Amino acid sequence: MAMGDDKSFDDEESVDGNRPSSAASAFKVPAPKTSGNPANSARKPGSAGGPKVGGASKEGGAGAVDEDDFIKAFTDVPSIQIYSSRELEETLNKIREILSDDKHDWDQRANALKKIRSLLVAGAAQYDCFFQHLRLLDGALKLSAKDLRSQVVREACITVAHLSTVLGNKFDHGAEAIVPTLFNLVPNSAKVMATSGCAAIRFIIRHTHVPRLIPLITSNCTSKSVPVRRRSFEFLDLLLQEWQTHSLERHAAVLVETIKKGIHDADAEARVEARKTYMGLRNHFPGEAETLYNSLEPSYQKSLQTYLKSSGSVASLPQSDRSSSSSQESLNRPFSSKWSTANPSTVAGRVSAGSSKASSLPGSLQRSRSDIDVNAAAGAKAHHAAGQSVRSGRLGAGALNAGSYASLEDTSDKLDGTASEDGRVRAKLSAPLAGMGNAKADSRGRSRTKMVSQSQPGSRSGSPGRVLTTTALSTVSSGVQRVLVNSASAQKRSKIPRSQGCSREASPSRLSVARSSRIPRPSVSQGCSREASRESSRDTSPVRSFQPLASRHHSRSTGALYAPEVYGASGPGYGISQSSRLSSSVSAMRVLNTGSDVEEAVADALKKPARRRYESYGMHSDDDANSDASSACSERSYSSRNGSIPTYMRQTEDVAEVLNRCASSNWSERKEGLLGLQNLLKNQRTLSRVELKRLCEIFTRMFADPHGKRVFSMFLETLVDFIQVHKDDLQDWLFVLLTQLLKKMGADLLGSVQAKVQKALDVTRESFPNDLQFNILMRFTVDQTQTPSLKVKVAILKYIETLAKQMDPGDFINSSETRLAVSRVITWTTEPKSSDVRKAAQSVLISLFELNTPEFTMLLGALPKTFQDGATKLLHNHLRNTGNGTQSSMGSPLTRPTPRSPANWSSPLTSPTNTSQNTLSPSAFDYDTENMNSEDIYSSLRGVTEAIQNFSFRSQEDMNEPLKRDSKKDDGDSMCGGPGMSDPRAGGDATDSSQTALDNKASLLHSMPTHSSPRSRDYNPYNYSDSISPFNKSALKEAMFDDDADQFPDDLSLDHSDLVAELLKELSNHNERVEERKIALYELMKLTQEESFSVWDEHFKTILLLLLETLGDKEPTIRALALKVLREILRHQPARFKNYAELTVMKTLEAHKDPHKEVVRSAEEAASVLATSISPEQCIKVLCPIIQTADYPINLAAIKMQTKVIERVSKETLNLLLPEIMPGLIQGYDNSESSVRKACVFCLVAVHAVIGDELKPHLSQLTGSKMKLLNLYIKRAQTGSGGADPTTDVSGQS
């Protein structure tokens, strides 16, 4: 068909004037391309003139935009220089801010879109952070594409097209997001908008080959809008031309159904477009296309046949509708090039030098062909190397073999042929062979013959000429003779059906044909033949390791491993192993001439890089990636998905892809993402801070994944790897991780899933600091927002018990939260509904008692009497049972022969980890109680209880003395009970009585420095912190680190001072530089844990004021982080807040109003620490006015905070403060918010727990019903804490 005909055919149908109008203008992409980022198309989208959209002067009408305009606009932007990733991030943040707000002036938004292109031209894609910010730009680009200003829409479309052109498959996420919006532009009456949208979609289809785009296009093929349907089929046709088969396989059924609907479309032009797509479908899926054709009604079959005949593509029809066909070649050929085996002249046409611009698109590869001889490409290579050029279209004898042609990148710029309607160059048929098959050119310029070589099903094993599609002859003349003979004989059997299933095993050319085919299937046979499926097996490939992995610069879209000189000589090897490729060439040698031809065939086979599949890990043996029968180009094969390098084998860009899949709403994509994440983690690929944060958010949501069996199991496996690789960076997320895993232990899960949850808990326990885990568990236990089920309670208690066995005594922190948690555990020992909870709670108390006996004893002393009684009774029973158990086992040879000193078992350093291996007692704790009797134990324990209750705290002067006196022992010996306790293995008289042991324990209480006391009746900040009184380095050395003074060089504080100054400078950038300020806050949080006191002396006030000011920042994550830093400073240096208590309390309470839950949670945590850090009297005086005047939720937070403070106040002090406290609580009891009323009741209960019936006179204003409710809560608190005097009644009734 002549070029003129092509043009008129192109111009027939036009909706908005952007159909191709000429094949002459070359499609050039100015964007810089690296070899690792090709244009991702199987054939050059515009090798000799890409489709051009009609311009304003063309049929598009005024305002229409064509692709040439797009290409010019790609680089027609202001030049810009990128000096650092930080500068790039700032620029992208500003662009996003402008584009996300449609209130900005339209020209500002248009310039912002141009600036994105400027960044691309300047090489922004080389920076890792660019892809992270590109994800954030999705929404802004969509908003711009919806804009009412046509200029903004045009710039948005150009920018999207440029992103697709430069980034290729890396733009998959953005393309998926923007394509639906672009389709909405198609029916727009403004030509500039409609044509811009269409052009952008074309660019995306050409350069971004993402299977997820297919449903977006096919869904628009059934749109109510006629122009949208027409365009959609046109786009679908382009997609079928440009994409590799493996990218289409997943949606083959959708494509068939869509094309079928298009052929039945009510609109005539849409039907014409749909018929065009049939040819593309035929090239990729011949079987499905034939099935589709046969399912059509005769009238539609006839229309399709007529159309294909008129376009010269009758060879694409099924066998029944043409005179001859090949039962095999057409199945394997991607572009139905049936004429090639009979047409040697085409080789000359393709190899001869010409003026085509086929290589204008760097990195693109032509589609591979299935009918290439082993010798053909080698000959073409030799021919090319010798500089031979056959411009006449004829081929000299011996230069190339019959049927050979080079559909190669290397020779694609030497084509001498006709330009087809879509701009691709097709070879002309030369005169001597023109009559040799009645050749016709289809609408794309392909030459086809009606008569091609064909063999009968029964004769395949004896037909060596079929090997490599009957092209293995060394001269043109003999090749022509053979082809003519085969063609003539085949004419008589024009209706042979395609071979099915088992009939293919006998054909020696099956494997080789499949090997050179671009249809990525392990075996072309559809049925029971397993012979060829070996090609996809990973275990039968002896020479797989010739060359490890194709380098990343190979074509991503072709799905083929690249061959440096000749592409496709023995097939591109679509993920097929080296040995299979070798065997194909060797099998072809049966009919090859000896000598150089054979050597070249072997050499060519050996040149092909070995492929390596993406292997999943051992836990997924049922996955399709491990299946022998899996497709050679299945989803996880080497050339899978969007390119030759699997998604999960790329480094920087694939993390974003993996995270996107993990966050997908589709469970199968989440599973894929988890699999990819596992691969990254197994390869020790560490994630950046931003990636970690996002992954933690995704994982938090995954804990509630409804697809438990499918996704949650794999999530748990990935979680284990994630924790092991990033345990040092996940301490901020540990609360969520630990609490969610414990909650899952209480859920109804399959046994295998529950085992994985348990494994994740075990890994968590081993990976994080014990003290941090312990604090989180204490916090979780007392969290009033949680109502754990019985199973969850058991899980929490068992975890605490196991953790206690591996904790050091110093990890046991006697804080208010710990006391509250222990009191709750004591109440759980009487849980009426579950014996498991009762037993687990008892075990926890015993474990904590064993962990740090002095500290735990002090803690019990700070609890109300009812709690003490419950715990004392339990410990008494435990000691009695342990003693009896040891006595009964004394005669056993298995018992440890050397008894330990009684001081040893009472020592807090005797943790279960040291002792459990030395005893066989049921409790797994090692008590040396051979010489104890139960009466001694009971009396001694009673003495300890009395000592606790009568314990008197020393004065402030006495408190500071031990600090100096025992400076070297303070963080070791004295915390463990004095010098006598410093060595847990200290020997002693084995016959010491139990009374002596318990006396040691009681004396240990009195010898403890009181700054470690859990609760002082008179406020002392050192009771609530681990800091030392004199905040300077010399005192620090003298008090604690005399022996290690050299660890504190003199310039340490100076370095820290400079660092703090830098951090403060960064933090002063309010509402700007979000990422940098986050980093600064994290650094500041680390500094809070370092004891550089001189630095804090200098900068504390500035830090505090900046943090409080940051609480008003517009970024919620910054506000939450500031509260966390404040909490850490409170925790480590509470004494510094004495002069800033009121300001700190006010700002922390105000943060409870924040609309973001993350900020509120951080505020609650800060308030909780604040309540235990500053002076109770000072705190109450600040809180009382707030409770009386503030609105919800500030008053609620203040009441909760006051409740915590009251738990620390002595009876005498509370009596003095009661007149200030009560009015606010009485007022709150009448509040309209039920949560405020409830908080007031709890606070009153806390007051009653301290002062008892002295509260009664202050409750006179309460009504009878409120008094009754209050009494109920008081009695519940008393009974829950181990029993109380039943006559207690604040109302005076008994």
UniProtKB/Swiss-Prot annotation:
Gene Ontology molecular function, alphabetical: actin filament binding; dystroglycan binding; microtubule binding; microtubule plus-end binding; protein tyrosine kinase binding
Gene3D superfamilies xrefs: Leucine-rich Repeat Variant
Polar residues bias spans: 335-346, 353-367, 880-892, 901-922
Tissue and organ distribution: Brain-specific.
Consequence of changing R838A: Decreases affinity for microtubules
Region TOG 1: start-end pairs: 60-311
UniProt biased composition (Low complexity): 316-334, 453-467, 627-641
Modified residues (Phosphothreonine): T787
UniProt key word Lyase: no
GO cellular component: axonal growth cone; basal cortex; cell cortex; cell leading edge; centrosome; cortical microtubule plus-end; cytoplasm; cytoplasmic microtubule
Superkingdom of origin organism: Eukaryota
Effect of K839A: Decreases affinity for microtubules
Sites bearing Phosphoserine, chain numbering: 8, 14, 316, 327, 330, 360, 368, 370, 407, 455, 459, 463, 478, 489, 507, 525, 529, 585, 587, 596, 621, 627, 892, 952, 955, 1013, 1029
Domain statement: The two SXIP sequence motifs mediate interaction with MAPRE1; this is necessary for targeting to growing microtubule plus ends. Two TOG regions display structural characteristics similar to HEAT repeat domains and mediate interaction with microtubules.
Subunit structure: Interacts with microtubules. Interacts with MAPRE1; probably required for targeting to the growing microtubule plus ends. Interacts with CLIP2, ERC1, MAPRE3, PHLDB2 and RSN. The interaction with ERC1 may be mediated by PHLDB2. Interacts with GCC2; recruits CLASP2 to Golgi membranes. Interacts with MACF1. Interacts with mtcl2 and MTCL1.
Protein known as: CLIP-associating protein 2
Organism: Homo sapiens
